[in-house]
């Protein structure tokens, strides 16, 4: 019987390594796919590990710039903070992973793709809805969700099948990381009353360990895209990585969040997003300088919906594509420089400038240079307040009657 091919999203961890053996038992040839999203892993080692465990082919693809420009950039421009806190670190990477799974599956003639998600997380939804959107004819296999083993049973299976067991298996934490940040759950973090231990963090320093002197960074934007730090041009991925180091040193971007998952439960997550939080803050300030009031007041409505769509795994939905078009239109004049102070866990905007600035000092000033037409205020107030005045007159008559 000829074996079918399956493309597996491979991380190098225990779950996806065991999944290779498990899929072999189901008569599949496994093609492993590992993406470099900027998490800092030794991906060459991961690629070789997949082959040693039993994959017939192993891909390692650097997608850092694609992730930065096609995914993180939109999140920054839409100021996506789920429930006001979470910058969608993992949620942003899942549609890109799904896209590459489908591309490799079609290239290799595979009939199925597989992922290592459990049956109680958001990621299974994000992967599978994205895959259905891109190629509804591919079978999707979720080994971890199907086998329902305990951790002990999984380790026993790994030992029986000569699957290498990671040396960090005793770590209580479940970690996911990419350019946009780092998420951490499980272990003591499952108690929402417990303070996160310092070893739960990696990208940021504790406040007591941060410098006692602030650091200033000037971020340059072109049509809504961050392009420079302190006058030096970077690719977007490199800019994000550089800013992660700068802001992380000052403790910026630590987030402790009890969030409402798509699957109906609450979970406690600890995030580190130094660059994401700094860029979102700076970008919002530049928009405040360059957007007319109507756009500035309406855009948050769109931002909220975009955030929900991405969190819920609907990156490739028609509505998200339509809202993205609106978002892109709003970025045309978001060009300028923002000065940010990094200090003791805060990214504080202290200055902003733009050739498209709608701030007119001659209209705003209260000095002798004031050019605002004060006399025009009388007629404006009369017309603006007319509906309220008429309503009050009508209702007062009824009360008097």
UniProtKB/Swiss-Prot annotation:
What EC number(s) has UniProt assigned to this enzyme?
6.3.4.5
Can you name one GO molecular function term for this protein? argininosuccinate synthase activity
Which reaction equation describes what this protein catalyses? L-citrulline + L-aspartate + ATP = 2-(N(omega)-L-arginino)succinate + AMP + diphosphate + H(+)
**One Pfam match, by short name?**
Arginosuc_syn_C
Provide the residue positions that the database annotates as binding L-citrulline: 86, 122, 126, 174, 183, 259, 271
Q: In which pathway does it act?
A: Amino-acid biosynthesis; L-arginine biosynthesis; L-arginine from L-ornithine and carbamoyl phosphate: step 2/3
Spell out the family assignment given in the record's similarity comment.
Answer: Belongs to the argininosuccinate synthase family. Type 1 subfamily.
What protein is this chain from?
A: Argininosuccinate synthase
Native source species: Bacillus cereus (strain ATCC 14579 / DSM 31 / CCUG 7414 / JCM 2152 / NBRC 15305 / NCIMB 9373 / NCTC 2599 / NRRL B-3711)
């Amino acid at each position: 019987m000829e074996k079918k091919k399956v493309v597996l999203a491979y991380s190098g961890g225990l779950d996806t390594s065991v999944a290779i053996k498990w899929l072999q038992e189901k008569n599949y040839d496994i093609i492993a796919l590992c993406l470099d999203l900027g998490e800092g892993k030794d991906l060459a080692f991961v690629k070789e590990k997949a082959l040693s465990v039993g994959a017939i082919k192993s891909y390692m693809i650097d997608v850092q710039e694609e992730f930065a420009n096609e995914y993180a950039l939109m999140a920054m421009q839409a100021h996506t903070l789920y429930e006001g806190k979470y910058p969608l670190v993992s949620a942003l990477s899942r549609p890109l992973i799904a896209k590459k799974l489908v591309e490799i599956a079609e290239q290799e003639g595979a009939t199925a793709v597989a992922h290592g998600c459990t049956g109680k997380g958001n990621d299974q939804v994000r992967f599978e809805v994205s895959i259905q959107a891109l190629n509804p004819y591919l079978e999707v296999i979720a080994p971890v969700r199907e086998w329902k083993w305990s951790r002990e049973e999984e380790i026993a299976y790994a030992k029986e099948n000569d699957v290498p067991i990671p040396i960090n298996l005793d770590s209580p934490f479940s970690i996911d990381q990419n350019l946009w940040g780092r998420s951490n759950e499980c272990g003591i973090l499952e108690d929402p009353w417990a303070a996160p231990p310092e070893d739960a963090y990696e990208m940021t320093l504790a406040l007591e360990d941060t410098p006692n002197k602030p650091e200033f960074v000037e971020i340059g934007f072109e049509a809504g895209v961050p392009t420079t730090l302190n006058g030096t041009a970077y690719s977007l991925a490199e800019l994000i990585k550089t800013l992660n180091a700068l802001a992380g040193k000052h403790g910026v971007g630590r987030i402790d969040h009890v969030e409402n998952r798509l699957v109906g439960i609450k979970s406690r997550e600890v995030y580190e997003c130094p660059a994401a939080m700094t860029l979102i803050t700076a970008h919002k300030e530049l928009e405040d300088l360059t957007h007319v009031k109507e756009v500035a007041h309406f855009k948050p409505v769109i931002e909220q919906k975009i955030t929900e769509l991405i969190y819920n795994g609907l990156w490739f939905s028609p509505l998200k594509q339509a809202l993205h078009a609106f978002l892109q239109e709003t970025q045309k004049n978001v060009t300028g420089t923002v000065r940010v102070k990094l200090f003791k866990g805060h990214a504080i905007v202290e200055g902003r400038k733009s050739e498209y600035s709608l701030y007119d000092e001659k209209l705003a000033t209260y000095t002798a240079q004031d050019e605002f037409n004060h006399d025009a205020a009388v007629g404006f107030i009369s017309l603006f307040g007319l509906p309220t005045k008429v309503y009050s007159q009508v209702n007062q008559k009824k009360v008097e009657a």
